[in-house]
Amino acid sequence: MATKVYIVYYSTYGHVERLAQEIKKGAESVGNVEVKLWQVPEILSDEVLGKMWAPPKSDVPVITPDELVEADGIIFGFPTRFGMMAAQFKAFFDSTGGLWKTQALAGKPAGIFFSTGTQGGGQETTALTAITQLTHHGMIYVPIGYTFGADMFNMEKIKGGSPYGAGTFAGADGSRQPSDIELKQAFHQGMYIAGITKKIKQTSA
């Protein structure tokens, strides 16, 4: 039976979604792994989103809390708001109380990825505060560490991401798109976490 990896994200302007697409490619590069992209529900009105100049959402399906249980491993992605995950994603986690009560997600590997506007925008604080959500669910947090190799030490270019997970800088006006090195790190994260998820499933079978 194939290992199921879900990539669950929220994206306002497409930066997190672009990383999610690359993470999906990386996870799919691991044999016998099925990967699915999901969005979390939007909580802002169309009026507010319009004033934010947010583009229309893609056709990626919106997930419900109960659907998380179907996955063997989950990679969560979100933009940063004042140093922590966006309210849309926090609202989704807040809706998983039923899963918390039964510990339905306990033992599942989980990773995180993120986007900030600037280099001081909170990439690591967002990761650190997100880990609390995984902890209360009993999930196994899987950071990428320095497994991405030499590019983790690249100082020649602006680069998002960290040992906590893949990341990108959107720029203060959102005009900067994920760079090649950021996309490569996202691919690596998908491949890395899918591989670990597959190993855990095989050993627990």
Swiss-Prot record:
Induction: Up-regulated by 2,6-dimethoxy-p-benzoquinone (DMBQ), 2,6-dimethylbenzoquinone and menadione. Not regulated by host root contact. PANTHER family: FLAVODOXIN-RELATED PROTEIN WRBA-RELATED (PTHR30546), NAD(P)H DEHYDROGENASE (QUINONE) (PTHR30546:SF56). It is an enzyme of class 1 (oxidoreductase). Its EC number is 1.6.5.2. NAD(+) binds at residue 13. Its cofactor is FMN. FMN binds at residues 11-15, 112-165. Inhibited by dicumarol. Residues 5-192 form the Flavodoxin-like domain. This is Quinone-oxidoreductase QR2. GO terms for molecular function: FMN binding; NADH:ubiquinone reductase (non-electrogenic) activity; NADPH dehydrogenase (quinone) activity. Optimum pH is 6.5. NAD(P)H:quinone oxidoreductase reducing quinones by a two-electron transfer mechanism. Can use either NADPH or NADH as electron donor. Can use menadione, 5-hydroxy-1,4-naphthoquinone (juglone) and 2,6-dimethoxy-p-benzoquinone (DMBQ) as substrates. Mitigates the toxicity of exogenous quinones in the rhizosphere. Keywords: Flavoprotein, FMN, NAD, NADP, Nucleotide-binding, Oxidoreductase. One of its GO terms (cellular component) is membrane. InterPro entries: Flavodoxin/NO_synth (IPR008254), Flavoprotein-like_sf (IPR029039), Flavoprotein_WrbA-like (IPR010089), FMN_Rdtase-like_dom (IPR005025). SUPFAM superfamilies: Flavoproteins (SSF52218). Binds 1 FMN per monomer. Gene3D superfamilies: 3.40.50.360. It catalyses: a quinone + NADH + H(+) = a quinol + NAD(+); a quinone + NADPH + H(+) = a quinol + NADP(+). Belongs to the WrbA family.
